[in-house]
Design a protein with these regions (language model features):
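ABC-type nucleotide-binding domain
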Residues: 2-5, 356-609
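Transmembrane helix-loop-helix hairpins at lipid-water interfaces of multipass membrane proteins
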Residues: 3-4, 41-101, 182-186, 297-301
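Juxtamembrane helix-loop junctions of ABC transporter transmembrane domains
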Residues: 16-19, 23, 46-47, 54-67, ...
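A short amphipathic helical element positioned immediately N-terminal to and/or at the very start
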Residues: 23-38, 144
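An intracellular "coupling" helix at the cytosolic face of ABC transporter transmembrane type-1 domains
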Residues: 31, 35-39, 133-134, 152-159, ...
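Hydrophobic alpha-helical transmembrane segments of ABC transporter permease domains
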Residues: 35, 46, 101, 113, ...
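Helix-loop-helix
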Residues: 71-75, 179-193, 263-337, 341-342
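Conserved catalytic Walker-motif region of ABC-type ATPase nucleotide-binding domains
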Residues: 128, 250, 338, 372
Length: 609
């Protein structure tokens, strides 16, 4: 969980709406991502090739059986059953062997598909860990979820089938063509003539379909974002009578997805009938000329039977190849979205040699002195923090106040290294945080956020989240210290009570008390409290304040609060406006100045009265 800026989350403007911009590059990146399994791919390809070739000879063997029988009848002799039985045995053996090899090939490609799916999901999750928080501020959650779920599923489901189908279709097509040319060059030319004509028509159709398929994937990501936001924000939607407007917004995107899907499927579905029309014309021509050739003795009846079977099946691999084109486009469109995500700019690399040990040396005590030295920070091009400097002594409780957008939360984001300053330095016990690893800096702090995050699981599991080797007894002790132990024990299953997915079976105040308990358990060296009492009742607020006072005792701590009554006991209050510290001092000193802080405090006091 991390702190967010106050800015509104922006829509991702870089989502590709036209499919793979560079087909060759997308294909190259796709190959580079799967080449670690090239041995499996080669094995699957060889097995598919053998299985297909065995099936290709089926009509030829049937033709030989027909020729043997008709020649015997033509010569008014006894049918050579031994030859026919032998050919029948060869035919059955061929089909069985092809089926067994095909099964083995299917197992290999399925395992390859599962491995690749696992790799993609792991890569996306690892990438998320390395991305700066700013990326998630600008990118809708649903879009990232769409890449991890929908796009990965598209590749996983289609990849194995497509790999097999490509090999099978091309092998079948080439095998049929070679045997057809062997049986009759003239008849083969009639069949082949239909291919380029149908290809021209189909290519133009698929070119248009590609655009709709890519747009469909993009719109699906937007729809996921809307669904996720509507689902998690139902309480706010209903409280503000916003349901009808939300439905209209959903319907608009849903209709857009419907139209794009309909257009994509309509154009994609044209490939089969178009191919069928041209190949059926060729089929009619072959039947007419083939009949003449049989009568003329140019080709045997078994030969023309085999040729017609090949021709009858000839359209299948061509149709499959045509349909594969659209499937490949979908795969590459999904793959490109994933690869683009994996190539997003990451956080700056960690320092090779961390200076963390300098402040955690066994020979010296950790103090908790924090200094901001001439810090400047801009979010995109908007300046947020301007030449910010302050030195905080060990053990001080520092409150940061100011209007929305003043830069309060950004200060904490910089302190936790969720962002790094554009200029200036942040030091802890005299060591620059930029010269420590991010996880080392974050280990120094315990955080209690306004947006309390509890996952679906037991209360005990939630309280132990992030802690290392904590016993149940330590959890009980921390809960008693915070004052939440009585509440937990009053639940049906106590500490083993399962919190629902949205943790809506406990109140906001109880959630915050639990997050404070979690912080107590982690025994942090310093503390951060971000507006954690701004949406609870007065009694719970007092419980939280008491718990926080115990937690911050002797620790350097930072408090961000809009309710200024909660930070009257702070050692130092920093008053911010437009990224600058305009006032600082304790509560009494700032009131005596009768400045901006006094104005804020008195206005809130008047509202409370």
């Amino acid at each position: 969980m991390c702190l967010r800026k106050g800015e509104t989350k922006m829509q991702d403007k870089n989502i590709n709406s036209q499919g793979p911009k560079d087909f060759k590059n997308a294909l190259k990146r796709f190959w580079l991502s799967i080449r670690e399994w090239k041995i499996k791919i080669i094995v699957a390809a060889v097995l598919s090739l053998i299985s297909t070739l065995l099936m290709v000879f089926g009509p030829m063997i049937l033709g030989m059986m027909t020729t043997s029988a008709t020649e015997s009848l033509k010569n008014q002799s006894v049918i050579n059953w031994s030859e026919i039985n032998f050919l029948a045995f060869v035919l059955i053996a061929t089909f069985l062997l092809s089926a067994v090899i095909g099964y083995i090939q299917g197992v290999v490609t399925s395992s390859l598909s599962v491995l690749y799916e696992k790799k993609l999901r792991n890569s996306i999750l690892e990438k998320m860990r390395r991305l700066p928080i700013g990326y998630f501020d600008k990118t809708p959650n649903g879009d990232v979820m769409s890449r991890m779920i929908n796009d990965v599923d598209m590749i996983s489901v289609s990849f194995a089938e497509t790999l097999t189908q490509i090999i099978t279709s091309f092998t079948t097509l080439v095998g049929y063509l070679v045997i057809m040319l062997y049986l009759s060059v003239t008849l083969s030319l009639i069949a082949i003539f239909a291919v380029p004509i149908s290809t021209i028509f189909i290519s133009s159709v698929l070119k248009k379909a590609k655009v709709y398929f890519a747009a469909e994937r993009t719109t699906l990501g937007k729809l996921n974002s809307i669904i996720e936001e509507n689902f998690s924000g139902q309480l706010i939607i209903k409280a503000n009578n916003h349901a009808e407007k939300s439905i209209k917004g959903f319907d608009k995107i849903n209709d857009q997805l419907y139209n794009e899907s309909r257009q994509a499927q309509f154009l994609s579905s044209l490939t089969f009938p178009l191919t069928h029309v041209f190949l059926n014309l060729a089929y009619a021509g072959v039947c007419m000329l083939g009949g003449y050739y049989v009568i003329s003795g140019v080709i045997s009846i078994g030969g023309i039977q085999a040729f017609i079977q090949y021709l009858n099946r000839f359209n299948r691999p061509i149709t499959e190849v045509a349909q594969l084109s659209s499937t490949i486009q979908q795969i590459l469109a999904a793959a490109e979205r994933i690869f683009n995500f994996l190539e997003e700019v990451e956080e700056k690399p960690e320092v090779e040699k961390s200076l963390f040990k300098q402040i955690m040396n066994k020979d010296r005590k950790f103090l908790g002195e924090v200094e901001f030295r001439n810090v400047n920070f801009s979010y995109d091009v908007k300046p947020i923090i301007k030449n910010f400097s302050v030195k905080i002594k060990p053990g001080m409780q520092v409150a940061i106040v100011g209007p929305t957008g003043a830069g309060k939360t950004t200060i904490v984001n910089l302190l936790m290294r969720f962002f790094d300053p554009n200029e200036g330095e942040i030091l802890i016990d005299g060591v620059e945080t930029s010269k420590m690893r991010r996880d080392e800096v974050r280990d120094l702090f315990g955080m209690v956020l306004q947006d309390t995050w509890l996952f679906s699981g037991t209360i005990m599991e939630n309280l132990k989240y992030g802690a290392k080797r904590v016993s149940d007894e330590e959890v009980y002790k921390a809960a008693k210290l915070v004052g939440v132990d009585h509440f937990i024990k009053s639940l049906p299953n106590g500490y083993q009570t399962v919190i629902s997915e949205d943790s809506d079976n406990i109140s906001a105040g109880e959630k915050q008390l639990m997050t404070i308990t979690r912080a107590v358990i982690s025994e942090p060296l310093m503390m951060i409290l971000d507006e954690a009492t701004s949406n609870v009742d007065t009694r719970t607020e007092q419980l939280i304040q008491d718990a926080f006072s115990k937690l911050t005792k002797g620790r350097t701590s930072f408090v961000i609060a809009h309710r200024l009554s909660t930070i009257r006991e702070a050692d130092l209050i920093l008053v911010m406006r437009e990224g600058n510290i305009i006032e600082q001092g304790n509560h009494k000193e700032l009131l005596a100045k009768n400045g901006f802080y006094a104005e804020l405090y008195n206005s809130q006091f008047s509202e409370d009265v």
